[in-house]
Curated annotation (Swiss-Prot):
This is Small ribosomal subunit protein uS14. The gene is rpsN. Part of the 30S ribosomal subunit. Contacts proteins S3 and S10. Belongs to the universal ribosomal protein uS14 family. It comes from the Bacteria. Coiled coil: none annotated. The lineage of its organism: Bacteria, Pseudomonadati, Bacteroidota, Flavobacteriia, Flavobacteriales. GO terms for molecular function: rRNA binding; structural constituent of ribosome. InterPro entries: Ribosomal_uS14 (IPR001209), Ribosomal_uS14_bac/plastid (IPR023036), Ribosomal_uS14_CS (IPR018271), Ribosomal_uS14_sf (IPR043140). GO terms for cellular component: cytoplasm; small ribosomal subunit. It comes from Flavobacterium psychrophilum (strain ATCC 49511 / DSM 21280 / CIP 103535 / JIP02/86).
C-alpha cells in the first residue's frame, strides 16, 4: 500500500497538468521554450506516473483495468472482475 502522501502528490500532479495543458500547447506551437521553462515542473505530463486506483502501487500497472497486477490477481481469483477467468488449456 502506497503512502497517502504519494497518492495525494500524484493527484496534485494530474490537476496541475490539466490546469496548464492549454498554455503548454500554445507555448509549444509558438516555439517559446523559455516560457515553457517558466511553468511549474509538475505541469509536464511526463512527470505523471500510473498508479493502482485501489492501493496506489506504482509498479505492475495494468492500463486496461487501472489497477496493479497484484490487485488484479486477487480480484480475478475472487470473481470481482467480470469476464476474467483463470486460463486453462
Amino acid at each position: 500500500m502506497a503512502k497517502e502522501s504519494m497518492k495525494a502528490r500524484e493527484v496534485k500532479r494530474e490537476n496541475t497538468v490539466a490546469k496548464y495543458a492549454e498554455k503548454r500547447k500554445a507555448l509549444k506551437e509558438a516555439g517559446d521554450f523559455v516560457g515553457l521553462q517558466k511553468l511549474p515542473k509538475n505541469a509536464s505530463p511526463v512527470r505523471m506516473h500510473n498508479r493502482c486506483k485501489l492501493t496506489g502501487r506504482p509498479r505492475g500497472y495494468m492500463r486496461q483495468f487501472g489497477i496493479s497486477r497484484v490487485t488484479f490477481r486477487e480480484m480475478a481469483n475472487n470473481g470481482l472482475i467480470p469476464g476474467v477467468k483463470k486460463a486453462s488449456w
